[in-house]
């Protein structure tokens, strides 16, 4: 099973690159984050599941036609697909900027949610995506 994950920062502007990536590497699953649209492009040989709420978030998961997976849940920050052998979470995790009121608590809620999801699964869970881990200021796109 070959899985590719990429924060595309806008799926429409990267459509040609995504298509080349799919043709070159022939992945079974492609997980994209920060898609910024609810209308993901279609690529030959793949079906797509997409969820987006605003211009800053969104996830899309492409499954090759030879892969059988069942969509189970999504919001603008995650999309879950269940397979026979595992559960896949494509995640664009909320940013946890301590300088913005409410961001830390929102991130903690997400962290609690993902821990419960993993604990309650009977199958292995694969989490891929942009985990937005900002351990130090150097990890930030907007350092002080």
Regions found by a protein language model. Give the residues of each.
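Short amphipathic alpha-helices and their capping/turn segments at secondary-structure boundaries
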Residues: 20-23, 77-84, 112-123
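Structured beta-strand-rich core segments of catalytic domains in phosphoester-bond hydrolases
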Residues: 35-99
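Short, flexible loop segments at the rims of nucleotide/cofactor-binding pockets, characterized by
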Residues: 5-12, 71, 103-108
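N-terminal, active-site-proximal structural segment of metallo-dependent hydrolase catalytic domains
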Residues: 1-43, 59
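Surface-exposed cleft-lining segments at the edges of enzyme active sites
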Residues: 92-114, 141-144
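Short catalytic/ligand-binding loop motif for oxyanion handling, primarily in non-cytosolic enzymes
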Residues: 12, 38-41, 96-100, 134-143
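Active-site-proximal beta-strand elements of phosphoester/diester hydrolases
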Residues: 1-10, 85-97, 128
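Metal-dependent phosphoesterases centered on the DNase I-like endonuclease/exonuclease/phosphatase
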Residues: 29, 110-144
């Amino acid at each position: 099973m070959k899985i590719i994950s990429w924060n595309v920062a806008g799926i429409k502007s990267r459509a040609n690159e995504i298509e080349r990536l799919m043709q070159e590497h022939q992945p079974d699953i492609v997980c994209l984050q920060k898609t910024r649209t609810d209308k993901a492009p279609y690529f030959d040989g793949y079906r797509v599941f997409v969820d987006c709420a605003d211009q800053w978030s969104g996830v899309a998961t492409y499954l090759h036609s030879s892969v059988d997976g069942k969509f189970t849940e999504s919001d603008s920050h995650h999309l879950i697909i269940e397979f026979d052998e595992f559960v896949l979470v494509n995640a664009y995790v909320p940013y946890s900027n301590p300088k913005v009121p409410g961001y830390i608590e929102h991130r903690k809620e997400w962290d609690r949610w993902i821990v419960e999801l993993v604990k309650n699964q009977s199958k292995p869970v694969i989490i891929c995506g942009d985990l937005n881990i900002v351990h130090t200021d150097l990890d930030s796109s907007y350092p002080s």
